[in-house]
Amino acid sequence: MEDVKLQFPSLPLCKEEAEDWTYPMRREMQEILPGLFLGPYSAAMKSKLSVLQKCGITHVICIRQNIEANFIKPNFQQLFRYLVLDIADNPVENIIRFFLTSKEFIDGCLQTGGKVLIHGNAGISRSAALVIAYIMETFGIKYRDAFTYVQERRFCINPNAGFVHQLQEYEAIYLAKLTIKMMSPLQLGRPLCIQSGSTGSLKRTLDDEDELGNMQVSAAHEG
């Protein structure tokens, strides 16, 4: 019986030479993948509605901690579909549990021709970690490669050390999850052998991803 081999799409290449990074660009959003934007809350404020509409944004992932809810808000719930996640920018925060929900939200957006903005407060740590995880799992690449890909488009990203550790562990988690999904009942009785590069140690269980934590989905969408 052959081992399960996973296949992934290729990462999109840059259409043109990347723009030189300047400090003010950290206050704007950047397109990381076609239809997927990463940025700070300042890119999603009420004053930026015309920019969001010009870019074709239809979905927004708003990442905030409870104590930030007074100033980080889903400002356009009548225009865009929102996923609001309660995540602290803290090294001990279990961010892996939010990867599945955010990936499903992003996939649902892109598959229907929409465009999504992922933002936290500064667009540097929490939101960047979610985008990196999405790219890792979607394209089957390692943390370092996904980090570099995102940083080439938003230079200021800097996930905290705890998030980096979890992202490094996540490679083994998503590969195991996808492999199990593809295995036949007979294969499930055999030892797991994953054919997609080095996976590292699987210290976290797949249950980490299934714990959704405290999150809220706002789905008010015109039309």
UniProtKB/Swiss-Prot annotation:
One Pfam short name: DSPc
Record GO biological process: negative regulation of SCF-dependent proteasomal ubiquitin-dependent catabolic process; regulation of ERK1 and ERK2 cascade
Gene Ontology CC: one annotated term: cytoplasm
Signal sequence region: none
PROSITE patterns registered for this protein in UniProt: TYR_PHOSPHATASE_2, TYR_PHOSPHATASE_DUAL
GO molecular function, one term: F-box domain binding
Domain Tyrosine-protein phosphatase residue range list: 28-176
CDD domains the UniProt entry points to: DSP_STYX
Biological role: Catalytically inactive phosphatase.
Family of the protein in this entry: Belongs to the protein-tyrosine phosphatase family. Non-receptor class subfamily.
Record PANTHER family: SERINE/THREONINE/TYROSINE-INTERACTING PROTEIN, SERINE_THREONINE_TYROSINE-INTERACTING PROTEIN
The protein's name in its UniProt record: Serine/threonine/tyrosine-interacting protein B
Organism: Xenopus laevis (African clawed frog)
The gene coding this protein: styx-b
